[in-house]
């Protein structure tokens, strides 16, 4: 595949290398170039042309051991990765190489990681609800089939656990294919996820692509595109409804900001790259539904210092159909998943899409929780006795609703000792409607904590 163009390394600064070619043979932007390093082949991607004859490139592997004067060979094409059924059950790196110590993948087809987003004619608007079996998500911030969902949260509030539960539920209940792109997260989590998928039997329906924290920024910047390319194949060639999980989209931005200064760009707000919105758009616009199939994407978004106005999460917000916000205050109450029902929202929580009953119950839940939040200052200063009877009832119901929003997860069984629960949407709506209507005012609050359906809460209270 190589064009035979040979260049020479003239400068190496961390993850960025400059390669000099003869002026008429300089490789195109985004071309892959290979360099034979002491520890194997190093692939770099052309990011800029400097002068007439120099290509400034970003490395996909560590540049340790590279020296000036080494030969670099132009492949004449962007990075291409294997796609198709052969990729299921395997772990890949950014270059599409197998990293699970298994035998190499013999895919019938390879595709470049840089592609145009589908045109307007090819796209299809998503209005259908995608059931996850997680009560708080399905009720308050329902996901659209073929939509984009963001999981926002600081460090350690449960973003990755929620993603793992979604993978588990969707593989078991919907039998759909998933692609998981691990972008700049912990190697241990990637390893745990792989082994849990083997144990739960969902590995055969999933392709995994990892570029962990210890990888150079070039790999972390491009690994999301590698996963997306694999998902696009299932959507376009096989007409599948694919799930694309990205954990963590913030690390994609972070990697871009690491190489941006080395590429000589002036930093923008808070030190981020000036091309932040463009880079994010190039990735997000390819995640969409077409007339052939859909890609439903769930993206964990790390929020630096819990500040939602930071440019990285703020830029991500613009692309999302639903946001699931994880709150430290709720996790401190011991309620998991720690989803904030007042901060989370969805574009499809609309009577025309979800139906009148679902809409009214969801808004009723938010109303009662909002009133409880307003009353908390009064309760803290004066105590419950100073509230009117109506407010006392609101608080009692709000506390039951708050606890009923918790749920035991399948993927956390080994830590919690509680069996996981999948709750159908109809059961979720019925349960919250009955609590709001006061049918369960006689049950103790503890009965609602970590149960599936409302019938289980009643059963738990009766066992006492």
UniProtKB/Swiss-Prot annotation:
SMART domains: AAA. It is a peripheral membrane protein. It comes from the Bacteria. Its EC number is 7.1.2.2. GO terms for molecular function: ATP binding; ATP hydrolysis activity; proton-transporting ATP synthase activity, rotational mechanism. F-type ATPases have 2 components, CF(1) - the catalytic core - and CF(0) - the membrane proton channel. CF(1) has five subunits: alpha(3), beta(3), gamma(1), delta(1), epsilon(1). CF(0) has three main subunits: a(1), b(2) and c(9-12). The alpha and beta chains form an alternating ring which encloses part of the gamma chain. CF(1) is attached to CF(0) by a central stalk formed by the gamma and epsilon chains, while a peripheral stalk is formed by the delta and b chains. This is ATP synthase subunit beta.
